């Protein structure tokens, strides 16, 4: 596998946390991805309870109270939500 290839299994989220300015996702292999919270307006405006109510899906994270879905691959690519 080249260094540019990413195995899908490597992208599974294990946990989600928030700092005042970032969304931080820890992957199953221990890596952490931190992205600016202002990239995701729904999450930025959400209450702590709404942010805490998330579901880890096969390829990303879903917040049912917010109807927000983020893929781990999208976070790595720097894709912002609109």
Walk through the language-model features, giving the residues of each.
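Motif-centric detector for short Cys/His coordination patterns
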Residues: 1-82
């Amino acid at each position: 596998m080249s260094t540019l290839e990413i195995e899908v299994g490597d992208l599974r989220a294990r946990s989600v946390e928030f700092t005042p300015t970032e969304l931080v996702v820890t992957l199953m292999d221990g890596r952490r991805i931190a992205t600016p919270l202002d990239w995701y307006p729904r999450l930025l405006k959400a209450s702590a309870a709404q942010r805490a109510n998330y579901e880890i899906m096969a390829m990303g994270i879903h917040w049912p109270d917010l109807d927000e879905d983020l893929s781990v691959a999208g976070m790595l690519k720097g894709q912002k939500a609109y």
